[in-house]
Amino acid sequence: MLFRSKKIGFVEKEEILTKREWIDRYKVFTPRANNIGTELNDDNFNTFVGEPGTICTESYIVLGANLGLDYESAENLRKYFTTRFARFQHSLTKASQDATSKTYQFVPLQDFTPSSDINWAKPVADIDRQLYEKYGLTDEEITFIENMIKPMV
């Protein structure tokens, strides 16, 4: 199954020329164009888990394909990108709506498994608090992030 901007289609596996090894893995797809780090409302709502057998066009960025994720871990990765913490880190390198793999360079990699030091079963606001504590953020830094990055509704 092929995901592209606002459409789903099918393509033969033999037609895939790059990163074929990602096809049969869990991964997360997030739109390449998003408003994180811009003055516009954040619209990172279209991030979703790509199950084995799925691919995407350049309309999306693939996250976690090399992490050996199962469905639960992929869902935790997807949830991570709804946190203010991760979206703030992502915003640090963005000058426009366009995102590339390089715009994720300051987003720290986490353990997305059930044995993680982060309890991914909690609501996003609680996950943010766990991340703030893990990275030793001050009250001033937390306030700055929370004033700059709106919560996902």
Task: Go through each PLM region and give its residues.
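Polybasic, glycine- and aromatic-enriched phosphate-binding surface used to engage nucleic acids
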Residues: 1-120, 124-126, 133, 147-153
